[in-house]
Regions:
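Adenosine-nucleotide cofactor-binding segment
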Residues: 1-47, 99-101
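Solvent-exposed, non-membrane alpha-helical residues enriched in polar/charged side chains
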Residues: 24, 28, 52-53, 77, ...
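Short conserved AdoMet
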Residues: 32, 56, 140-144
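Short catalytic-loop micro-motif centered on adjacent basic/acidic residues
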Residues: 37-40, 60-64, 121-124
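Glycine-rich phosphate-binding loop and adjacent beta-alpha segment
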Residues: 46-118, 151-152
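C-terminal capping/lid region of NAD(P)-dependent oxidoreductase domains
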Residues: 111, 116-125, 133-152
Length: 152
């Protein structure tokens, strides 16, 4: 609950807990029954079908993480009925040139918003490089909200 409240401080209109059995219904309610236009999925695995249930017709799901597992159930019929764009993303198979182009585009799209404060990026804590073990312990404990920074 505390993390969801913090998300609202950073501009989220609605913050849902994907572990709640009611989150799909809450997402649909928050969108007037239409469903979510864009889901950025860092969990994958066991939430794949729930994401599609929460998505709008012609919605988009971008899978950027696999914290919930590499495999899971996938309702191909629901995917087709809603005409969902399901996009997988990784940097592991990209060339250096592709990564540079993505960084260039990201800067063009986001840098001004960050500089003006329209987009705020939470930094949870800053550790000297010598205390990297403590930083990793904080991350493993999932006690942070935002980025953990190592300074040199």
């Amino acid at each position: 609950a505390a993390r969801r409240a913090k998300l609202k401080e950073f501009g989220a209109d609605v913050a849902l807990d994907s572990r709640s059995p009611d989150w799909v219904e809450e997402a649909r309610k928050a969108t007037g029954g239409r469903g979510v236009d864009l889901i950025v999925d860092q969990i994958s695995g066991y939430v794949a079908n729930a994401n599609m249930q929460a998505a709008a017709v012609r919605g988009r799901i971008v899978n950027v993480g696999r914290l919930g597992g590499m495999k899971g159930e996938f309702d191909f019929d629901l995917h087709a009925l809603k005409r969902i764009d399901y996009i997988g993303v990784t940097f592991r198979t990209r060339s250096v040139e592709e990564i540079r182009e993505i960084n260039r585009l990201m800067r063009a799209d986001l840098l001004l918003a960050v500089e003006t404060g329209a987009l705020r990026l939470p930094v949870d804590s800053v550790y000297p490089f010598a205390d990297a073990d403590a930083a990793f312990a904080r991350m493993r404990a999932n006690a942070h909200f935002g980025k953990i920074v190592l300074s040199l």
